[in-house]
């Protein structure tokens, strides 16, 4: 990034911060702060061990310095501006989840498609946190990172004192890591008629049970019934390992029988297991993959982590780190709603071919002098794909 581009970006960020609505963390004086400056680029120098006593101090700093990236600690400290972590004296920490395209398997290459994919993972995480951990919507602060994903902030008193290992256990649960399906899908003894041997029955948690068992049951039966309702259902089931035409026909019959489906929902999987003993295991594994959420474990486990400040700008995109309610998250379009700069034309020198979709426009930019809307020009400059001016 050349000097002219640095000055331009810093001036635009400064202009933004003069009127920006910044969402400051609770217990502001107990937070450590860190920033990355345009002045230091291309070097990445985190200037941390800062603290602010009031909202006014934060606003003055942002307006005066216009940093490229702004972070604050998830932790609360007695002395947040002390030069070493030991001297800061850790008190507690918010519970943070980071969902980023870099850590989500199968994320598309297209920026817009990638962000849609990450949002779906984020909403899955919300379901797990509310249904299985009992958090309420108001306990969870959702934030678009300004780049490639979303953060969840939880400041519930019950989680503030959790150690790193305990936070990693939460990640293990929501990712389905280490989930032992053999302990969920069990054989249960059933008394036979007088004089007969005791029989066994394949039992799974009912769809109304809590935790992974009920979650898997509901997802698995819904998926099976969706397949069974199709005209070519039998053909679809022959696509499973070791299921021939006869077996597929019997499976479809079971899934179209409401009495049998009610038994399946209650956890009695005997009808399906008799037809094909592997199908429940296969489908349960599929459900875990579909229902689990991929989060960045080191972020959640780090009780001294710095996290982006909501309302600040992301120095690699020029977009706003945006606070959202869960209802807002569902309809949120970051490539429109997180853009804060104008449409006025800006001349720039593109140094590598670039393509991005912003504000509903597909922008394909070739090398050389170009004129783009301000928001797109800033995005390219922040990405290192262009320099300011002709």
Swiss-Prot record:
The UniProt gene name for this protein comes to priS
Q: Which family does the UniProt entry place this protein in?
A: Belongs to the eukaryotic-type primase small subunit family.
Under the subunit heading, UniProt states: Heterodimer of a small subunit (PriS) and a large subunit (PriL).
One family from Pfam that matches here is DNA_primase_S
- One GO CC term on file: primosome complex
Q: Is Oxidoreductase among this UniProt entry's keywords?
A: no
- Per the entry, which co-factors are needed? Mg(2+); Mn(2+)
* Catalytic residues (positions): 98, 100, 296
Q: What does this protein do?
A: Catalytic subunit of DNA primase, an RNA polymerase that catalyzes the synthesis of short RNA molecules used as primers for DNA polymerase during DNA replication. The small subunit contains the primase catalytic core and has DNA synthesis activity on its own. Binding to the large subunit stabilizes and modulates the activity, increasing the rate of DNA synthesis while decreasing the length of the DNA fragments, and conferring RNA synthesis capability. The DNA polymerase activity may enable DNA primase to also catalyze primer extension after primer synthesis. May also play a role in DNA repair.
EC numbers on record: 2.7.7.-
Q: Extract one GO BP annotation from the record.
A: DNA replication, synthesis of primer
> What is this protein's name?
DNA primase small subunit PriS
Q: Give the species.
A: Methanococcoides burtonii (strain DSM 6242 / NBRC 107633 / OCM 468 / ACE-M)
Question: What lineage does the source organism belong to?
Answer: Archaea, Methanobacteriati, Methanobacteriota, Stenosarchaea group, Methanomicrobia
Annotated HAMAP family: DNA_primase_sml_arc
Keywords, A to Z, come to: DNA replication, DNA-directed RNA polymerase, Magnesium, Manganese, Metal-binding, Nucleotidyltransferase, Primosome, Transcription, Transferase
Kindly list the GO molecular function terms attached to this UniProt entry: DNA-directed RNA polymerase activity; metal ion binding
């Amino acid at each position: 990034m050349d000097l002219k581009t640095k000055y331009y970006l810093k001036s635009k960020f400064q202009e933004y911060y003069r009127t920006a609505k910044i969402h400051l963390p609770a217990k502001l004086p107990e937070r450590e702060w860190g920033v990355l400056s345009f002045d230091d680029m291309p070097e990445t120098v985190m200037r941390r061990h800062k603290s602010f006593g009031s909202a006014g101090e934060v606003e003055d700093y942002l307006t005066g310095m216009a940093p490229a990236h702004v972070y604050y600690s998830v932790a609360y400290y007695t002395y947040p501006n002390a030069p070493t972590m030991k001297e800061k004296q850790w008190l507690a920490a918010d519970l943070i989840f980071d969902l980023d395209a870099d850590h989500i398997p199968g994320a598309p290459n297209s920026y817009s498609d990638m962000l849609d994919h990450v949002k779906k993972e984020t909403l899955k995480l919300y379901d797990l946190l509310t249904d299985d951990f009992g958090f309420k919507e108001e306990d969870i602060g959702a934030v678009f990172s300004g780049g490639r994903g979303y953060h969840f902030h939880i400041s519930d008193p019950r989680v503030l004192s959790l150690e790193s290992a305990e936070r990693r256990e939460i990640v293990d649960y929501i990712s389905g890591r280490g989930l032992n399906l053999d302990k969920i899908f069990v054989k249960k003894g059933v008394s036979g008629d007088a004089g007969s041997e005791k029989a066994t029955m394949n039992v799974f948690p009912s769809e109304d049970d809590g935790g992974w068992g009920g979650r898997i049951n509901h997802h698995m039966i819904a998926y099976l019934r969706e397949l069974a309702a199709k005209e070519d259902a039998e053909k679809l089931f022959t696509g499973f390992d070791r299921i021939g035409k006869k077996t597929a026909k019997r499976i479809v019959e079971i899934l179209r029988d409401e009495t049998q489906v009610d038994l399946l929902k209650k956890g009695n999987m005997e009808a399906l297991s008799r037809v094909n003993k592997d199908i429940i295991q296969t489908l349960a594994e599929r459900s875990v993959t579909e229902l689990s959420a991929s989060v960045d474990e080191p972020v959640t486990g780090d009780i001294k982590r710095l996290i982006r400040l909501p309302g600040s700008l992301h120095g690699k995109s020029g977009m706003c780190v945006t606070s959202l309610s869960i209802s807002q998250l569902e309809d949120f379009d970051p490539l429109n709603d997180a853009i804060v700069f104008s449409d006025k034309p800006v001349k720039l020198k593109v140094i590598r071919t670039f393509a991005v979709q912003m504000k509903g426009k597909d922008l394909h930019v070739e090398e050389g002098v170009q004129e783009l809307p301000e928001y797109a020009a800033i995005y390219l400059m922040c990405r290192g794909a262009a320099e300011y001016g002709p």
